[in-house]
């Protein structure tokens, strides 16, 4: 954790979830009510088909709702895409950009991710900018070089601690059950913090840096307790309310 930084526990449902899944969001919305919500933010990013209904379900809950991607343009002939303005119109508060699955499946570049983050900022959405190295890059000892390049290329100049969150997701750890050691996480997050401070000054000291990659109830407390880890971006474990709330509850000990 970073002193004086409010943690964020975020769930990315990816291409999962139908109307029947709204029961899980209802349970999460109830589960995050209480004293811990005054210290820790909770966010779920369902598929776009559920975005508006999910925000309505959370109207009287501190549970935040966001989207998984946005187009870099406001409007236009972009079949199948969703704009940042559309997300804001559905009362979403956050949007994930640059997830490794988007970078791989859709060949998204740092330049494009940067444009998407800027589009989010234009309509007062908080951009969650994802970065991380592949297994081959890790084996080649390139982790820090990749993080430096992606931070420099993916973050727009107007990024602040208020409108931007960084999510470090080692690509090789996503959905594999593999996780880096706490020392690996500590070194990566310390490096990113230094890079953010070099570029953004004091704002870089309090930008939230999340860890993502096979986060689950069994390892949440250990991972979230690492210095400069300001929360989690959770995949599969966010699909069930019980698992998501268990990870969220790790902060009951960490913030005591």
Swiss-Prot record:
SUPFAM superfamilies: Triosephosphate isomerase (TIM) (SSF51351). PROSITE patterns: TIM_1 (PS00171), TIM_2 (PS51440). GO terms for cellular component: cytosol. GO terms for molecular function: triose-phosphate isomerase activity. Pfam families: TIM. InterPro entries: Aldolase_TIM (IPR013785), TIM_sf (IPR035990), TrioseP_Isoase_bac/euk (IPR022896), Triosephosphate_isomerase (IPR000652), Triosephosphate_isomerase_AS (IPR020861). Substrate binds at residues 12-14, 175, 214, 235-236. GO terms for biological process: gluconeogenesis; glyceraldehyde-3-phosphate biosynthetic process; glycerol catabolic process; glycolytic process. It is an enzyme of class 5 (isomerase). It catalyses: D-glyceraldehyde 3-phosphate = dihydroxyacetone phosphate. Its EC number is 5.3.1.1. Keywords: Cytoplasm, Gluconeogenesis, Glycolysis, Isomerase. It comes from the Bacteria. Belongs to the triosephosphate isomerase family. Involved in the gluconeogenesis. Catalyzes stereospecifically the conversion of dihydroxyacetone phosphate (DHAP) to D-glyceraldehyde-3-phosphate (G3P). HAMAP family: TIM_B. This is Triosephosphate isomerase. It comes from Agrobacterium fabrum (strain C58 / ATCC 33970).
């Amino acid at each position: 954790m970073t002193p004086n930084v409010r943690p964020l526990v975020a769930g990315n449902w990816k291409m999962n979830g139908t109307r029947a899944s709204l029961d899980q969001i209802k349970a999460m919305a109830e589960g995050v009510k209480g004293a811990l919500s005054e210290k820790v933010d909770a966010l779920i990013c369902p598929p776009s088909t559920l975005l508006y209904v999910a925000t309505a379900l959370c109207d009287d809950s501190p549970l935040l709702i966001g989207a998984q991607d946005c187009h870099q343009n406001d409007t236009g002939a972009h079949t199948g895409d969703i704009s940042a303005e559309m997300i804001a119109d559905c009362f979403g508060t956050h949007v994930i950009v640059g997830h490794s699955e988007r970078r791989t499946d859709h060949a998204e570049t740092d330049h494009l991710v940067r444009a998407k983050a800027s589009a989010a900022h234009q309509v007062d959405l908080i951009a969650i900018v994802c970065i991380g190295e592949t297994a081959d890059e890790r084996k080649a000892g390139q982790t820090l070089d990749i993080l430096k390049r992606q931070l420099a290329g993916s973050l727009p100049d107007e990024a602040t601690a208020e409108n931007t969150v960084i999510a470090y997701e080692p690509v090789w750890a996503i959905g594999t059950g593999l996780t880096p050691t706490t020392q690996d996480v500590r070194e990566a997050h310390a490096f990113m913090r230094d890079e953010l401070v070099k570029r953004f000054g004091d704002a870089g000291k309090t930008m939230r840096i999340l860890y993502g990659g096979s986060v689950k109830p069994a390892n949440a407390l250990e991972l979230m307790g690492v210095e400069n880890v300001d929360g989690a971006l959770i995949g599969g474990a966010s699909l069930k309310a019980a698992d998501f709330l268990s990870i969220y509850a790790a902060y009951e000990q960490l913030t005591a």
